[in-house]
C-alpha cells in the first residue's frame, strides 16, 4: 500500500482476503474507503481456500513445539515456480505476523497447523471450521461492514 497514515482516502481493488485486509486497515485508520470488486459479492478466490493460510514462526506453531522460520519458508517457496527472491522473502517474513493479526484482530481460531505439500515444516493454519478461507474472509467482510456503519 502506497499510503502512509494518516491517509484520508483510499481505493481498494478486489474483495478477497488481501482487499479486505487493506480495506479494514484503511477504515480502521479513519480513511474514506471505496472497495471495488468484479463480482456481485466479496470474498474472491480466498473463500474457496480449503486448506488454510500459511504462516511461519507463529504462536500456534510455537505452542505445538513446531520449529519454523521465515528463512525456511522462503527457501521452500523459492523451490517452486518463478524465482522472485525479494517478493518471496517479503511474503514469508510477513506471513507469521499476518496470521497472528487475523487471529487477534478478528478473533479467528487458526490454532490447527498442518504440513502440506512443498513445505518442510507444518505451517498451514486453520481452525475447526470446515472451510477456513470462507471463515477468514467473511470475518474481514463483517468487520468492514461494521466499521462502515459508523
Which stretches of residues belong to each language-model region?
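Conserved N-terminal/central alpha/beta ligand/cofactor-binding core
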Residues: 2, 31-32, 38-150
Amino acid at each position: 500500500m502506497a499510503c502512509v497514515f494518516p491517509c484520508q482516502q483510499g481505493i481498494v481493488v478486489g474483495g478477497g482476503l488481501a482487499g479486505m485486509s487493506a480495506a479494514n486497515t484503511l477504515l480502521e485508520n479513519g480513511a474514506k474507503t471505496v472497495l471495488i470488486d468484479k463480482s456481485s459479492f466479496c470474498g474472491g478466490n480466498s473463500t474457496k481456500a480449503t486448506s488454510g493460510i500459511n504462516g511461519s514462526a507463529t504462536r500456534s506453531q510455537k505452542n505445538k513445539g513446531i520449529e519454523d522460520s521465515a528463512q525456511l519458508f522462503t527457501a521452500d517457496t523459492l523451490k517452486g515456480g518463478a524465482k522472485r527472491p525479494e517478493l518471496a522473502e517479503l511474503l514469508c517474513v510477513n506471513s507469521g505476523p499476518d496470521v497472528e493479526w487475523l487471529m487477534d484482530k478478528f478473533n479467528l481460531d487458526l490454532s490447527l497447523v498442518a504440513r502440506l505439500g512443498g513445505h518442510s515444516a507444518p505451517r498451514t493454519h486453520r481452525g475447526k471450521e470446515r472451510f477456513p478461507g470462507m471463515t477468514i474472509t467473511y470475518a474481514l467482510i463483517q468487520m468492514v461492514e461494521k466499521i462502515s456503519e459508523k
